[in-house]
């Protein structure tokens, strides 16, 4: 699968990022998202595969979607027999977030990117549109820190694993009211906090690379993005755990103002989740034999530059990670829109 569609999924996120970047700074997050969705769907439908969206985006925000259950790829067309050999058919599950950090893109802030993860059919956890408590950490701390520990205890373990003083550690936390106690605990333990408004996939990724000055991600975010983060962290050998959150009193968000703990538990039960308190490891959220992750910066971020337009073209920076080839490739691409382009932007 890696050799067949690895390059093509890079183009999927590149096209989504370019389309969304045209709306960067214009204050309309829905248009930034819609442009990314349309571009991502269009490019995926040009790939020789039978793909199924298992993690879509937008339900909670009432935004445009690549909806859960949607089929994409040339081999899903009514005339697929003309193009696809059933014996060579690639069936894959796909998790997408065409514009992760829509507000970041809309207001020209760093950290927005187009992301997706793929695996063979059944290889990605079909997370419900709930919230998830998350813990991400570098490979050196894999299996040593634990989401069931207090933040203070995990910071002590992380300090030992990384051979750093606690006051040299930086923890990323989303700026939400529900995290006030967590933020205070991290600070009281002596570590530093980097607050972000959106985009915790990027923060989870940053934990796996030395030199980013990000050593952990803690807190509650969206469950679908948790699966995407887990796919990347599994491929990178980093630590990732997730635990679904179903209590509106814990989430503290207006989107769940009319929901109840009991109603959420019933919804999870209907979704086939019999243990709502289960702690999921990265290998359970992205369990496939082969897992691919791809991202392309829309605005400048921790790991990738954003889309840069120039006369007649654009330049993108992407990242593709594979469990099959055990690689993390940074891809710098010049896109030539104008056939009469007189020069290319080198940097």
UniProtKB/Swiss-Prot annotation:
Database matches in NCBIfam families: glpX (TIGR00330)
Binding site for Mn(2+) 1: 33, 57
A GO term, aspect molecular function: fructose 1,6-bisphosphate 1-phosphatase activity
Statement: the UniProt record of this protein carries the keyword Hydrolase: yes
Source taxonomy: Bacteria, Bacillati, Cyanobacteriota, Cyanophyceae, Acaryochloridales
Top-level lineage group: Bacteria
InterPro entries with a match to the protein in the record: FBPase_class-2/SBPase (IPR004464)
Pathway(s) served: Carbohydrate biosynthesis; Calvin cycle
GO cellular component: cytosol
Reaction equations catalysed: beta-D-fructose 1,6-bisphosphate + H2O = beta-D-fructose 6-phosphate + phosphate; D-sedoheptulose 1,7-bisphosphate + H2O = D-sedoheptulose 7-phosphate + phosphate
GO biological process, one term: glycerol metabolic process
The keyword Lipid metabolism is annotated on this UniProt entry: no
Positions with a binding annotation for substrate: 100-102, 131, 176-178, 198-200
Keywords from the named record: Calvin cycle, Carbohydrate metabolism, Hydrolase, Manganese, Metal-binding
UniProt-recorded name of the protein: D-fructose 1,6-bisphosphatase class 2/sedoheptulose 1,7-bisphosphatase
């Amino acid at each position: 699968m890696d050799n067949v569609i690895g390059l093509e999924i890079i183009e999927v996120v590149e096209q989504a990022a370019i389309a969304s970047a045209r709306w960067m700074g214009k204050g309309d997050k829905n248009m930034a998202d819609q442009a990314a969705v349309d571009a991502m769907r269009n490019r995926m439908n040009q790939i020789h595969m039978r793909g199924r969206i298992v993690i879509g985006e937008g339900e909670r925000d009432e935004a445009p979607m690549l909806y859960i259950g949607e089929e994409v790829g040339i081999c899903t067309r009514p005339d697929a027999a003309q193009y696809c050999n059933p014996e060579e058919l690639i069936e894959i599950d796909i998790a997408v977030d065409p514009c992760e950090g829509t507000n970041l893109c809309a207001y020209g802030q760093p950290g927005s990117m187009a992301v997706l993860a793929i695996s063979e059919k059944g290889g990605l956890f079909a997370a419900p549109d709930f919230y998830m408590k998350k813990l991400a950490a570098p490979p050196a701390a894999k299996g040593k820190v634990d989401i069931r520990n207090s933040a203070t205890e995990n910071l002590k373990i992380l300090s030992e694993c990384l051979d750093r003083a606690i006051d040299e550690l930086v923890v990323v936390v989303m700026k939400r009211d529900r995290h006030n106690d967590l933020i205070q605990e991290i600070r009281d333990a002596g570590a530093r906090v980097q607050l972000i408004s959106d985009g915790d996939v990027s923060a989870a990724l940053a934990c796996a690379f030395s030199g980013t000055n990000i050593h952990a991600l803690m807190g509650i975010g969206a469950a679908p993005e948790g699966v995407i983060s887990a796919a990347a962290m599994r491929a990178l050998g980093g630590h990732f755990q997730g635990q679904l959150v179903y209590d509106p009193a814990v989430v503290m968000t207006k989107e769940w103002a009319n929901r109840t703990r009991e109603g959420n538990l019933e919804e999870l039960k209907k979704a086939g989740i019999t243990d709502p308190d289960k702690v999921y490891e990265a290998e359970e959220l992205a369990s496939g034999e082969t897992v691919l992750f791809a991202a392309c910066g829309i605005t400048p971020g921790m790991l990738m530059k954003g889309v840069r337009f120039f006369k007649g073209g654009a330049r993108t920076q992407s990242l593709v990670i594979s469990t099959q080839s055990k690689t993390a490739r940074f891809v710098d691409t010049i896109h030539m829109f104008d056939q009469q382009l007189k020069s290319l932007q080198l940097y």
